[in-house]
Amino acid sequence: MSKRPGDIIISTPGSKVRRRLNFDSPYRNRATAPTVHVTNRKRAWMNRPMYRKPMMYRMYRSPDIPRGCEGPCKVQSFEQRDDVKHLGICKVISDVTRGPGLTHRVGKRFCIKSIYILGKIWMDENIKKQNHTNNVMFYLLRDRRPYGNTPQDFGQIFNMFDNEPSTATIENDLRDRFQVLRKFHATVIGGPSGMKEQALVKRFYRLNHHVTYNHQEAGKYENHTENALLLYMACTHASNPVYATLKIRIYFYDSIGN
């Protein structure tokens, strides 16, 4: 009799060898890394090769080049350090100069397919010693009918309760002109304990945002005729400002109708 139920003694002319009969899968006893079960069914097939995806993900696939545009994919970067205040600041993201390079637009029309916001918000030496929490609100806006030499201020576009940027919504009479495409925030904490003097900002958004310029070549807000892309930033603390060191990259395609 064998001592274990899974053992059997196999006799051979040379020797007796004790073997273990294993009727399970050979992968059962192998040490494997823990797997993370993805609940989103669409994301589970995202990194698979095309021939292994179901038919639905092969047929109804978003095109690499936006409709009505042509390649190659061009890139424009905006790198700047800003002083984010309670009253808010604005950056024009769709400033692209007309020219022949990979950072220029060919004609009046182009489409911003995606945007990549990378950087950090931080406090200086004097502010980070104070006990406070400061949130920086980011609003990515579409200006459908740009007008004037510079974009409007934060307080002119947004309606706020008690001048609080976290409660900002578009003014009722401007909702047809301005639309909030994306909204996010980052938090820094000052004080001797639990201090978080800087916070990383890393966002990637697909927009398919069509921009139209006039006949001028310079990439300025005053030369926009349709759909300027704006980034508004405001901090929630009334007296302590925050510095934002950001690198903003837009990936765009030229329109066929130029």
From Swiss-Prot:
Highest taxon, organism lineage: Viruses
The task this protein performs is described as:
Encapsidates the viral DNA into characteristic twinned ('geminate') particles. Binds the genomic viral ssDNA and shuttles it into and out of the cell nucleus. The CP of bipartite geminiviruses is not required for cell-to-cell or systemic movement.
A GO molecular function term, named singly, is: DNA binding
Disulphide bond pairs: none
| Cell compartments where the protein resides | Virion; Host nucleus
Q: Which family does it belong to?
A: Belongs to the geminiviridae capsid protein family.
The root-end lineage is: Viruses, Monodnaviria, Shotokuvirae, Cressdnaviricota, Repensiviricetes
Question: GO terms for CC?
Answer: host cell; host cell nucleus; T=1 icosahedral viral capsid
Give the protein's recorded name: Capsid protein
Segment forming the signal sequence: none
